[in-house]
């Protein structure tokens, strides 16, 4: 499914995204969940932590990383040349990022992303996010706590904004 994880600054979004990427890529044999190809656009090297083009963080064995590449351009490149099942990006924010997410979805790929916001209302009312919400692009919205409870899930909502 296509999901977005949201919180305020330092809420654990990037850490959760990194873990999701690794688990999707590696799969889980005991749960009979095969791994899938994941394409990561790591604009600021926060997910893979690449050094001289080599990821330093484990993002899984079926993960391709575009490091230092603008999100929108990277998403387009991934779907045209790498054929990922899932595209992962950190911190959607610019208009072109949201347009690229729509292109990825229309190509048949799933998207896992993060964005700033501490409630479903925050996300729904962001200028460029609003269009994706109306079109029900994301199947789940995951909200994380911040501060001393960073990374704790506050709530999960479906594409209609209802708690799951």
Protein language model features and the residues they cover:
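Hydrophobic positions on the alpha1 helix immediately C-terminal to the Walker A/P-loop
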Residues: 16, 20
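Short, small-residue-biased leader/transition segments that mark boundaries at the very start
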Residues: 1-6
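P-loop NTPase switch/communication element
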Residues: 25-78
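Generic hydrophobic/aromatic pocket-lining and core-packing "Φ" positions
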Residues: 21, 75-76, 98-102
């Amino acid at each position: 499914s296509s999901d977005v994880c949201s919180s305020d600054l330092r809420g654990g979004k990037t850490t959760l995204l990194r873990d999701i990427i690794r688990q999707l890529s590696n799969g889980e044999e005991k749960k009979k969940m095969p791994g899938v190809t994941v394409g990561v656009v790591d604009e600021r090297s926060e997910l893979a932590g690449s050094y001289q083009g080599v990821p330093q963080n484990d993002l899984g064995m079926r993960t391709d990383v575009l490091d230092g590449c603008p999100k929108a351009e990277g998403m387009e490149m991934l779907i045209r040349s790498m054929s990922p099942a899932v595209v992962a990006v950190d911190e959607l924010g610019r208009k072109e990022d949201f347009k690229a997410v729509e292109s990825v979805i229309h190509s048949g790929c799933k998207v896992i992303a993060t964005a700033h916001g501490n409630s479903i209302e925050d996300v729904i009312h962001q200028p460029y996010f609003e269009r994706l919400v109306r079109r029900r692009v994301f199947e789940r919205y995951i909200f994380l706590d911040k501060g001393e409870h960073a990374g704790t899930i506050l709530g999960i909502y479906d594409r209609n904004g209802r708690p799951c």
